Amino acid sequence: MIMSLLDELKQAIIDGDEDIVAELSQKAVDEDLDLVDTVQSGLVKGIEVVGTAWKEGEMFLPDVMMSAEAMKVGLAILEPEIAKKGMSEGESKGKIVLGTVEGDIHDIGKNITGAMFTAAGYKVIDLGTDIKAEGFVAKAQEVGADIIGASALLTTTMIKQKELIEYLKEKNLRDSYKVLVGGGPTSQVWADEIGADGWAETADDAVELANKILGK
């Protein structure tokens, strides 16, 4: 039963069917299923298939966008419930301000990462896309963040990750936050070059990295 729901959810993401995704996500909540697994084995597995198909030219952008929107619908239902359960089980592991850098409106990877952080017990403040360095820092100061996570999906916007770190230095705040970077064109070499505290290739890597950095 559980596997079939997860398989159906994965397929609904691939099909970009928002209604079915909403229905199945709500069903997972109502039936008290493992919601972290629902995100990982349903939503994330589906979007991974879509990502691979897109890279190999088997899916076109409009279909990819439909799948991305369907995933947002699922996350909107599941994330608050995961966060609620996390809160009832005790304090959060830390606060993470997350966003896609200025000039970049890609958010699939960021959304998956945010969901995984929430599932792992972190309080996530997702700023969305096209966020300036000042925006990241202002929110981090406001909420008392431990980590700033900056995603860039374009080679032309990667530089904004560097600018974020430079802005923190400029404001004498560099030691106040750990900065994690990620996104398609980024790498460990890039993270080292710009002085980031870490780089994550996948959402799971990001959680592992945050745990390591904060000693959780």
From Swiss-Prot:
Residues 1-90 form the B12-binding N-terminal domain. It comes from the Bacteria. One of its GO terms (molecular function) is cobalamin binding. Residues 93-216 form the B12-binding domain. GO terms for biological process: homocysteine metabolic process; methanogenesis; one-carbon metabolic process; tetrahydrofolate metabolic process. It holds the Pfam family B12-binding_2. One of its GO terms (cellular component) is cytosol. Methylcob(III)alamin binds at H106. Keywords: Cobalt, Metal-binding, One-carbon metabolism. Probably harbors a corrinoid prosthetic group and acts as a methyl group carrier between MtgB and MtgA. A methyl group from glycine betaine is likely first transferred to the corrinoid prosthetic group of the enzyme by MtgB, and then transferred to tetrahydrofolate (THF) by MtgA. The methyl group may then be ultimately converted to carbon dioxide, and its oxidation would also provide reducing equivalents for anaerobic respiration. Thus, may function in the pathway that allows anaerobic methylotrophic growth of D.hafniense using glycine betaine. Belongs to the methylamine corrinoid protein family. This is Corrinoid protein DSY3155. It comes from Desulfitobacterium hafniense (strain Y51).
